[in-house]
Amino acid sequence: MKAAPTRSGGGALVASAILLVLAGEAARAEAPLHPGDSSTFTVMFENDLFGDSDAQYTNGIQIGWMSPDLDRFEQAHQLPPWMTGLSTHLPFIDVPGSQHNVGVALGQKMFTPDDTATRALVRDDRPYAGWLYGGLSFISKTTTRLDSIEIQAGMIGPASFAEDTQRLVHDLRGFDVPAGWDNQLENEPGLALIYEHRRRPWRSENVSGAGYDIITHAGGAVGNVFTYLNAGGEVRVGWNLPADFGTRLIRPGGDTNAPAAINDPRLDNRHRFGVHVFSAVTGRLVLRDIFLDGNTFEDSHSVHKEYLVGDLLFGVSVTFLNAKLSYAEAFRTREFDGQDRVHNFGSLTLSLTF
């Protein structure tokens, strides 16, 4: 038996923050910006309440900051030298003729089985699990290509505070709390190294007004949290397309929302409004997923994962003044043996360039 419908995460908080930010942006003077002068702050919120369910990947939130364009990573003076110094040891990202960015992120994800009413272990469904992490990314880009390497580190298990966060939010909103968190994965430090390459091979000749573009991506990750190879693409059609690298879900690989050229609507005073629809697809060959395979060094609940997993997104994005607001409906194929349906969740992203 399932519990009464419950909801995870801080949807009301995110909505309030979005309204406050947009109000503040509308009041700002329209001073011209440039990628070399402007940082980008991004808030992402994902929840299956948008898909009318409350299980599997049930909630995710991430906040991040991306530096202005830099000639060298060491110019990111907002970060300590030991962080930017890591770039000298990483491949693929110090491409001549490119601009560089450094980004930091903090996020949390929650996973639960379908049956959240029972305290007993649900052996044929995914484990309860949480993931609290920080990320440091290094990006090398032109207007048509982006290479990123991200280092993520954090905690799985009770130390992720996923149960505590869910209990707090559900208590505040009067929802039932899933009863089986005593069966969650054990505490385990997590570490992952992620590389992704994005390219814009096709776009319309118009850089303003009606237009389209296609953005492809490919990459992979290695670590005890997840190890995979991935590839996919995104199609965007609309008015005054942002000069960035598309809209993505909360997943590793660095932020793609920062403007990459001066003709981005968020930087160009002549075109401060834009709107577009988009569709994206991503496929992954999954070799390791701790949220399905269970703890690395401890005996824990696990299920037999699917090695091939895909995501399909449909969404709309609006740029106004210095803000970009995107919403996507995501459909994820079955991730393990016995999962009875495709998983549907919503993804809301607000990026602010300043």
Model-derived features: where do they sit?
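Short loop/turn motifs that connect adjacent beta-strands in outer-membrane beta-barrel proteins
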Residues: 30-38, 69-100, 141-148, 201-214, ...
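Transmembrane beta-barrel strands of outer-membrane/channel proteins
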Residues: 41-47, 102-110, 151-157, 197, ...
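Sequence/structural signature of outer-membrane beta-barrel proteins
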Residues: 46-50, 111-115, 156-160, 200-204, ...
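Residues that define the transmembrane beta-barrel architecture of outer-membrane proteins
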Residues: 55-61, 100, 128-132, 147, ...
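Residue-level signature of outer-membrane beta-barrel architecture
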Residues: 65-67, 108, 138-140, 197-201, ...
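Long, hydrophobic/aromatic-enriched structural stretches that serve as scaffold segments
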Residues: 86-162
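Outer membrane beta-barrel transmembrane domains
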Residues: 114-116, 234, 240-354
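Extracellular loop and loop/strand-boundary signature of outer-membrane beta-barrel proteins
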Residues: 119-123, 178-183, 219, 298-302, ...
